[in-house]
Regions:
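Solvent-exposed, charged helical/coil patches
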Residues: 1-53, 124, 129-133
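Residues at secondary-structure transition points
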Residues: 10, 14, 34, 38, ...
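Acidic pyrophosphate-coordinating catalytic loop
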Residues: 64-68, 123-124
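Nucleic-acid nuclease catalytic cores
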Residues: 88-133
């Protein structure tokens, strides 16, 4: 049975485009080979320049057995309270990285996330769009 989902909102698409452009700017300036934390602070700088609200290392609580628990999960960047960015600086994206962002989307009841690996020659090859429910 095929499931029908509502399309992604124009606002969310706009935030995704801003995020991809920010990643392109950061990557074209710094290139691959740095720590994830460096790319993260540079992405935050790009969002500030663009006038877009973004939060970094945002705690993701886990509801388990009716109790809200601090499980030490952290979203790398949450753009305007709507879009999750999971940043990586790895040789290649592994299935566990995709599972991680899907879990964050589910736990935070968000719809769209971008998995961005900066350790690639061309940033578009390291950018994956993840849609959840």
């Amino acid at each position: 049975m095929k499931r029908n989902f509502a399309p992604i909102s124009e606002e969310l698409e706009r935030l995704a485009k801003i995020s991809v452009n920010a990643a392109y700017q950061v990557h074209s300036t710094l290139g691959p080979g740095l720590l994830e934390s460096v790319y993260e602070v540079c992405m935050m700088h790009e969002f500030a320049k663009a006038g877009v609200k973004a939060e970094r290392q945002l705690a993701v609580p886990v509801l388990y057995d009716g109790v809200l628990l601090d499980a030490a999960l952290k979203v790398d960047i949450l753009v305007d309270g709507k879009l999750i960015l999971e940043l990586k600086a790895v040789e290649q994206i592994a299935p566990v990285h995709k599972a991680q962002i899907i879990t964050y989307l589910k736990l935070t009841d968000r719809r769209l996330g971008l998995l961005i690996n900066f350790n690639v020659p061309v940033i578009k090859d390291g950018t994956k769009r993840i849609v959840c429910g």
